[in-house]
Amino acid sequence: MKIDVLSLFPDMVQNGLSQSIIGKAIDRDLIDLEVTDFRDFSVNKHNSVDDAPYGGGAGMLLRPQPIFEAMDQVNAKNPGHKRVILLDPAGVTFNQKVAEEFAQEDHLVFICGHYEGYDERIRTLVTDEVSLGDFVVTGGELGAMVMIDAISRLVPGVLGNEQSAVTDSFSTGLLEHPQYTRPPEYRGLKVPEVLMNGNHKLINEWRDKMSLKRTYERRPDLLENFDLTADQQKWLREIKQETAEK
């Protein structure tokens, strides 16, 4: 997968994505990351990329010229189809489903904003406007790095165990079940017996039920449009009954 990032702070993005699993994926050429400082395309004598908004108002806006010309360079190097993602608090909220959709693409471009916002004409370059959530941060770099991490994990070969991406929270539509490792007991806290009895049918059933229970307790909104199996419907009734009796 080819990923371009247009940013005023390229070192921040490069350093943030050069670590751990994503860094190894870049080293193995599974992810081709290129970060461009769009300040390099500024044509005014002060090398600035922002200006005051027409009509007045607080803050400064990113001017279209540097970003348009940075995109011209991206398109010249790779003229094929690409998804161009604008990091914007007003965009659609990023989630696992969006990550899975973007992971199917061959080429992604992230435009990281700064200052008060963008000249509206910049939006004509983009295919998607995406936000991390209902809050505002100083720039788009952190959001881009989070999204790139989530997307890259879904690229074949990036994770050592492909099943990890399948069983992660949200990949199944539910939160992940509790997990345990050695020792079997620590400070009076014991690993559930079912996980140590070797019966994989019972283990899988326990995991499925605990995943449903954790989702009901922490993110019940995820169940609103979730198509429950007959077993899950039965477990959910039991979970609700247990909760009511507490």
Curated annotation (Swiss-Prot):
Its EC number is 2.1.1.228. It holds the Pfam family tRNA_m1G_MT. GO terms for cellular component: cytosol. It is found in: Cytoplasm. S-adenosyl-L-methionine binds at G113, L132, G133, D134, F135, V136, V137. InterPro entries: Alpha/beta_knot_MTases, tRNA_m1G_MeTrfase_C_sf, tRNA_m1G_MeTrfase_TrmD, tRNA_m1G_MTases_N, tRNA_MeTrfase_TRMD/TRM10. GO terms for biological process: tRNA N1-guanine methylation. Keywords: Cytoplasm, Methyltransferase, S-adenosyl-L-methionine, Transferase, tRNA processing. Homodimer. Specifically methylates guanosine-37 in various tRNAs. This is tRNA (guanine-N(1)-)-methyltransferase. The gene is trmD.
